[in-house]
Design a protein with these regions (language model features):
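Hydrophobic-ligand binding "helix-grip"
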Residues: 31, 69, 82-83, 98-144, ...
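Bacterial N-terminal signal peptides that target proteins for export
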Residues: 2-16
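Short beta-edge strand/loop motif at the mouth of beta-sheet-based domains
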Residues: 64-104
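Hydrophobic ligand-binding cavity/cleft-lining segments
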Residues: 28-79
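Hydrophobic pocket/interface hotspot
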Residues: 57-61, 92, 107, 118, ...
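A conserved amphipathic terminal alpha-helix motif
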Residues: 3, 31, 146, 150-187
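Bacterial N-terminal signal peptides
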Residues: 12-27
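Sec/Tat-exported extracytoplasmic proteins
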Residues: 54, 61-65, 69, 88, ...
């Protein structure tokens, strides 16, 4: 069963209102912004502080995305089916029933505790002729780490790229908020 829905169906008005309300600046809550958006693509930047040093934050991001990824944003509906092989050429993959699988992205740069970069067109972007680069940068902070997600997507969109950028920003901001809550809950 394919649970990834078209971008337009990802958020209802109440869900969007809740997402906006939850995005108020709080410790450990992800704050995201569409920093550039045109008909040909967009760039998102999402930042979060976590209570773990960069090496541990990187490990939590890469070893178990199932622990923090929202299952609503998987094809199988089960986050535990996600794996991330955090080395160059490694797959951010999902297994499904009947032997089916999906590659959500390929690792193109891995430097534990510093940077993880994937080539990826996430969710509904996968079926469009677009190219995406998703980077996670880790910087030490006195109380842990500052993690910055940058997602650049460009190409031939089959839907309005400006509208899609807002939906993708909302979903990835939610994911980073879940990541921060997961890491911060490991005190």
């Amino acid at each position: 069963m394919n649970r990834c829905r078209p971008a337009a169906a990802m958020l209802t008005a109440p869900a969007l209102a809740l997402a906006l309300a939850l995005s108020l600046p709080l410790a450990g809550v992800a704050e995201g912004a569409v920093t550039a958006s045109t008909a040909d693509g967009f760039t998102l930047v999402i930042e979060v502080d976590v209570k773990a040093p960069p090496q541990l934050a990187y490990r939590e991001l890469t070893v178990g995305p199932a622990a923090w990824w929202d299952p609503e944003h998987t094809y199988s509906g089960k986050a535990e089916r996600l794996t991330l092989d955090a080395r160059a050429g490694g797959c951010f993959c999902e297994s499904m029933d009947g032997g089916a699988s999906v590659s959500h992205g390929t690792v193109i740069y891995a430097d534990p505790g510093q940077m993880l970069r994937l080539s990826t067109a996430l969710g509904p972007l996968q079926e469009m002729a677009v190219v995406g680069t998703l980077s996670f940068a880790f910087a030490p902070r006195e109380a842990g780490s500052h993690v910055t997600l940058t997602y650049r997507v460009f190409g031939a969109f089959t839907e309005d790229a400006v509208a899609l950028s807002k939906l993708v920003d909302s979903v990835l901001t939610q994911q980073m908020g879940r990541f921060a809550a997961h890491v911060n809950g490991k005190d």
